A protein has these predicted regions:
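PRPP-associated nucleotide enzymes
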Residues: 1-215
Length: 215
């Protein structure tokens, strides 16, 4: 299932607008903070789907019954662009386990896209809820390869993908090719990719905007 959060008017859309704005992007601290806020809100929305149990909490004046989550998810992010989104999700799920994986485009000299997946640090995922954070879903290829690599650490009972912006083609590709039913939570879905497989209108390169241009 795909959840496009920006379709409902809220403060969330201001954060999406600011990460797109080429003038606001010049302030990398603000860019990172906005992605972090987006992660916090995506985490809040995902939290509504988790399992809860009524729990008694003692107050100074008595007891209160509150529905609390029965487990914390595992939050995985794709380095390096996913780190700010990861931090936002971790602000929401502050007792979550964490996983990190690298995925990057390797130049081929052609129009073909070659994605490399190398470093991985991940706990056992068996029967856990997994949230994979990546701010931009352009072609969906990186996410599909990361998905495959993470599943070598066990099969989660539920998987969520959290992204700020996705292309329509990436959404379609992931819906068709992911081996396990997955909920995709995204701020906005853009219709086009350019010749270099960047989302249009998108926002540019999220990793460079957050952490500086890479060599």
């Amino acid at each position: 299932m795909v959840h496009e959060i920006g379709k409902t008017n809220s403060i969330f859309n201001h954060f999406i607008a600011e990460i797109r704005d080429e003038e606001v992007q010049k302030d990398s601290l603000r860019f990172r903070r906005n992605l972090e806020r987006i992660g916090e809100i995506l985490g809040y929305e995902i939290s509504k789907t988790l399992t809860y149990k009524e729990t008694e909490v003692k107050t100074p004046l008595g007891e209160a019954n509150v529905e609390l989550m029965t487990e914390q998810p595992v939050i995985a992010s794709i380095l390096r662009a996913g780190l700010t989104l990861h931090n936002g999700l971790l602000n929401t799920f502050d007792k979550a386990e964490n996983a990190f994986i690298s995925a990057y485009r390797r130049p081929t000299g052609t129009d073909e896209i070659d994605v490399m997946v190398e470093y991985k640090a991940c706990p056992d995922l068996t029967d856990k809820t997994l949230i994979i954070a990546d701010p931009m879903l352009a072609t969906g290829l990186s996410m599909a390869l990361v998905f495959e690599a993470l599943l070598k650490n066990g099969t989660p009972k539920k998987i969520h993908i959290a992204a700020a912006i996705a292309s329509r083609s990436a959404i379609d590709m992931l819906k068709k090719n992911l081996p396990i039913p997955t909920d995709i939570w995204v701020g906005s879905i853009d219709e086009n990719l350019n010749a270099k497989s960047y989302i249009v209108p998108g926002l540019g390169d999220a990793g460079d905007l957050a952490y500086g241009v890479k060599l």
